[in-house]
């Protein structure tokens, strides 16, 4: 499994990139609005930080021609931009056109397997099932990841699965076991994934033993 960082915060992106643990970035209008910055300017900043790693940038238009126009503008910012498109009929029409133009797409707001299958057949590079939001309404988001992975494997579908709306490290571990290709996670989840009390205790013990040896 690969990891994308789900944020528009450049400091978090820098930290994750410097550790060498991410293979891309996902953003959405809410994340960019939270930063209070110009969308295109921030995308350029992100692309400068991560080089040729995938950067998903979402369109705002709701009609296919508008999505395609916006997507072309986004893709012109850098060759590694992946255009993020909502799972709607207009979105599928746009995905088909982006495929013909050679522009990668990430179909977002996937909440059932049929949506993922349709997006893949339209030509999506990635589909993003939302784990946490399904959990919020009493459904098992991880079951959806497994179902999509099984369907794609049975039919030889190459569209990659991005586990999205990841709330905690357990989501990551289980998504990896269930067949997700990628998990896109906030920086706080990356931090949580690295932590374990026995790791901290072990470091403290090593340092204590070293200092004791040096004082003799």
Curated annotation (Swiss-Prot):
Pathway: Carbohydrate degradation; pentose phosphate pathway; D-glyceraldehyde 3-phosphate and beta-D-fructose 6-phosphate from D-ribose 5-phosphate and D-xylulose 5-phosphate (non-oxidative stage): step 2/3
Molecular function as annotated in GO: aldehyde-lyase activity; transaldolase activity
UniProt superkingdom: Bacteria
Enzyme class: transferase
Any Pfam family: TAL_FSA
Protein family membership: Belongs to the transaldolase family. Type 3B subfamily.
BP GO terms, sorted: carbohydrate metabolic process; pentose-phosphate shunt
Keyword Transferase: yes
Residues of the active site: 84
GO CC annotations, alphabetized: cytoplasm
Gene3D superfamilies, per the entry: Aldolase class I (3.20.20.70)
SUPFAM superfamilies: Aldolase (SSF51569)
EC annotation from Swiss-Prot or TrEMBL: 2.2.1.2
Cell compartment(s), UniProt: Cytoplasm
Catalytic activity annotation: D-sedoheptulose 7-phosphate + D-glyceraldehyde 3-phosphate = D-erythrose 4-phosphate + beta-D-fructose 6-phosphate
Keywords: Cytoplasm, Pentose shunt, Schiff base, Transferase
Role played: Transaldolase is important for the balance of metabolites in the pentose-phosphate pathway.
Source organism per UniProt: Exiguobacterium sp. (strain ATCC BAA-1283 / AT1b)
Name of the protein in its database record: Probable transaldolase
InterPro entries xref list: Aldolase_TIM (IPR013785), TAL/FSA (IPR001585), Transaldolase_3B (IPR022999), Transaldolase_3B/F6P_aldolase (IPR004731), Transaldolase_AS (IPR018225), TSA/FSA_arc/bac (IPR033919)
């Amino acid at each position: 499994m690969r990891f994308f960082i789900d944020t528009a915060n450049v400091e978090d992106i820098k930290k994750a990139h410097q550790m060498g643990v991410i293979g891309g970035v996902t953003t959405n209008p809410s994340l960019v609005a939270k930063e209070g910055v110009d969308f295109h300017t921030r995308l350029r900043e992100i692309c400068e930080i991560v080089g040729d790693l995938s950067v998903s940038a979402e369109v705002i238009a709701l009609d296919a021609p508008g999505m395609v126009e916006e997507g072309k503008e986004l893709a012109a910012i850098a060759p590694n931009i992946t255009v993020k498109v909502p799972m709607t009929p207009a979105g599928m029409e746009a995905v088909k056109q982006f495929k013909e133009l050679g522009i990668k797409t990430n179909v977002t707001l996937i909440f059932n397997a049929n949506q993922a299958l349709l997006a893949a057949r339209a030509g999506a590079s990635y589909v993003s099932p939302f784990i946490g939001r399904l959990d919020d309404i009493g459904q098992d988001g991880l079951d959806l990841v497994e179902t999509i992975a099984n369907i794609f494997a049975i039919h030889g579908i190459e569209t990659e699965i991005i586990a999205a709306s990841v709330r905690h490290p357990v989501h990551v571990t289980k998504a990896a076991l269930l067949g997700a290709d990628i998990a896109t996670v906030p920086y706080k989840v990356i931090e949580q994934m690295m932590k374990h009390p026995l790791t901290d205790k072990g470091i403290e013990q090593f340092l204590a033993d070293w200092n004791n040896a040096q004082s003799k």
